[in-house]
């Protein structure tokens, strides 16, 4: 993708985007947040001036500021990060600095939301670019999941069976919105990472007859296959088709 070598200001737009390298087939949510164009004083500043302004701000704020940088960020961002890692690691890092009043998460929506969930009420979490979305997290939104849940409830029922097993246990991947994580919490479900997906599915099947896994169909399918569950028992619900 030629966009990977273009200057960052090329993507300074109010139009939501997954950025350079993203698949043209990825659907952006209609209600995706829009980023305001940055003031000219930043756009016209040299790289050296911008770097100095960041360094000065860090020095001035000291321990009150925590900058988290995802692995995918450019080097000129990573150099200022207090912690660098994947989304799960950075979410844990956010809890290690309760003295930080301001957490700047250089990542995408769901990452900043997760840090906000784990932070204290006194801390603020800032996402520098509001249009920084994740196509994986956007593969399922709360309205789609709720519709699927309601339809499955009509088919499978909503009451536990005679053994006390729930009809369906919702499981969401870490790369999902706060709304989906909250949905799982309300409905007896759980959040998983790629490394503990197997253990989480074992936990879920010990408590329920079925699992509704979202938004990453491949993580759910591959983990279930490794557990010996046949593909014939893994239907895919498509929100863009009647009755899924």
How should these model regions be labeled?
Residues 3-244:
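The feature marks the mature, well-folded catalytic cores of soluble enzymes
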